[in-house]
Amino acid sequence: MNTEALIEAAVEVDVQEAAPVVEPDIEVIPAIEAPAASLPAIVAPNLDDSSLYIHRELSQLQFNIRVLEQALDESYPLLERLKFLLIFSSNLDEFFEIRVAGLKKQITFAREQAGADGLQPHQALARISELVHGHVDRQYAILNDILLPELEKHQVRFIRRRHWTAKLKAWVRRYFRDEIAPIITPIGLDPTHPFPLLVNKSLNFIVELEGIDAFGRDSGLAIIPAPRLLPRVIKVPEEVCGPGDNFVFLSSMIHAHADDLFQGMKVKGCYQFRLTRNADLALDSEDVEDLARALRGELFSRRYGDAVRLEVADTCPKHLSDYLLKQFNLHESELYQVNGPVNLTRLFSITGLDSHPELQYPPFTPAIPKLLQNSENVFSVVSKQDILLLHPFESFTPVVDLLRQAAKDPHVLAVRQTLYRSGANSEIVDALVDAARNGKEVTAVIELRARFDEESNLQLASRLQAAGAVVIYGVVGFKTHAKMMLILRREAGEIVRYAHLGTGNYHAGNARLYTDYSLLTSDDALCEDVGKLFSQLIGMGKTLRMKKLLHAPFTLKKGMLDMIARETQFALDGKPAHIIAKFNSLTDPKIIRALYKASQSGVRIDLVVRGMCCLRPGIAGVSHNIHVRSIIGRFLEHTRVFYFLNGGDEQMFLSSADWMERNLDKRVETCFPVEGKKLILRVKKELESYLTDNTHSWLLQSDGRYVRSMPTGNQNARSAQATLLERLSNPVLSVR
């Protein structure tokens, strides 16, 4: 599949002219419609006008809705379609735990603050509720009416109670008696048994009872919390249900045998529910003496934050759902009635069935550059030239190998490393431990506040400290999100620096799922800059002048704004001007205003924004030269790439940062140049493969809608990820 050439439009369309945003024959999906902008045609638009901006949370929701749409795409294997549906659930959980919780908190403390779009938090919550209710209903309809029936055709069955045979009922009874009942603790509700404090996102049941117990109590209600250690999906042996993969939901088992938990009482109804709580840590790092100790205390509190959402079975009577809403101090608009398990993310356990490889993506082996294949010593290769890798198409192994070799190399003196998310069984951490034990000076800058990875990071910090490494937790008030490694090695009597800089985390698992760039370099100036940044993080001192590296919160934002302004001036001077940027999110108002000005001046701007985008493209007189697309596919798009035509002297940058205020103003981030015509051309071609994608590309319209791009006429189907997979990796019979 050849998509290496520039888009014809990118070559032929004059940058001074507006190009249409919507291509012909594009499938429009009204379900993801956002509030439309009403923009009068004015000569000098006010770039602070709120109608020029899309609300952040609504844009984030639309990304998740695009993820849900993939569950309907028959070009994906069936179990992968199920994964997309489950990712929608997982993303929605975090959205409520963090974003919705934040909006509710503003209202609670009377601190409502509108963003650039002008929408107040209470208005945003109303729109969020409307959107989410509709798409949660749609999600369960896709599951029940499309995916589960299709899976059944492949002998993957989720057997509902109404279809249980006598043999299956007997097996379920034994399983319930032996594995479930002994560890379940039902709680009757009365004055001495108050409503329990339920853990965030845990599975629970509200039970309506009739009768009087041994103590003469007649409460009428009970709660059954399902222990988290129990699997939510249980596989049934073939001798019970016949051949195939047959599963029963834990919730169905508890429903069927709730009577056994209340001997002598009549169960009138048993209904599953799940509560979502605020999971954002209320930790002010400036007010604590020991961040690690304070964080351990906050992690426990996270499980019991304020309620933000209630999910119940759609068969639950109104008087019971109203009772639950009252217990959790929630409004009826925060109630979600679902036709199926209340926590679909627990179905991830069955998406990798060994018995059905045909229902999953075909395996592949990430490639290793020939230069590294032919050399056992990574240092000898990197000392001669930069090595650029694009994961997962190219392997993350060279990055790990560099650190492993450093750990054993007698000439290596010191290793410095940032860690944001590295996983529980990290090869990177293993190598750092080995390096410390082998007498190297190892310093790890670990970001303890990486959301939902805090506990894992605390554990690896303890492990590194036990090995003798120096561990610090970044800078108070700023998350350390930069991805960088520095190795100091003595060669011919001198200390030589080697560095790794990346757009993604030091996480070998994610490197198989996320697209990210890695640069291995021994460039003197760049490695010196990395050393300076580590000195800033580890010690104290004034801002140090960098030669090549842009870094937040100091020079990165200004550098980006300056480069956008430079392209703007080229366009005003009648010269070709072009910006291509690919990243995860665009929310920073200053960056958006700069892009609007560039568009007005005639700069052609192509943005590939996977997630949130608060900019409205295609507005006459404002953003008519801006095109925004989002790519959703097999791999999570995670690279941050910035290209500037620069009057013909092209510049390319890779970064750990998105164009968001939090990244540019409140985090430690890096942005580094891609140097040399060969590497710049390579990255540019890879960017262009995304701009020509017409199978997994969604185009953002000026009214906030996304429409899916599709091949037109005799146009061949083009997928950026498929092209890069074909070009860079090696398909094989088994994953390695």
Curated annotation (Swiss-Prot):
This entry's Enzyme Commission designation comes to 2.7.4.1
A single GO molecular function term of this UniProt record:
polyphosphate kinase activity
Cofactor dependency = Mg(2+)
One Pfam family assigned to this protein is PP_kinase_C_1
* Any one of the GO CC terms: polyphosphate kinase complex
> Where's the active site on this chain?
481
UniProt keyword ATP-binding, yes or no? yes
Binding positions for Mg(2+)?
421, 451
Q: How is it modified after translation?
A: An intermediate of this reaction is the autophosphorylated ppk in which a phosphate is covalently linked to a histidine residue through a N-P bond.
Biological process GO terms, please?
polyphosphate biosynthetic process
**Does the UniProt entry include the keyword ATP-binding?**
yes
- Known catalytic reactions: [phosphate](n) + ATP = [phosphate](n+1) + ADP
Keyword annotations for this protein, in alphabetical order, are: ATP-binding, Kinase, Magnesium, Metal-binding, Nucleotide-binding, Phosphoprotein, Transferase
Task: Return the broad EC class.
Answer: transferase
CDD domains membership:
PLDc_PaPPK1_C1_like, PLDc_PaPPK1_C2_like
Q: Which residues bind ATP?
A: 91, 514, 610, 638
Name the family.
Answer: Belongs to the polyphosphate kinase 1 (PPK1) family.
Protein's job = Catalyzes the reversible transfer of the terminal phosphate of ATP to form a long-chain polyphosphate (polyP).
Q: What is this protein called?
A: Polyphosphate kinase
Lineage, top ranks: Bacteria, Pseudomonadati, Pseudomonadota, Gammaproteobacteria, Pseudomonadales
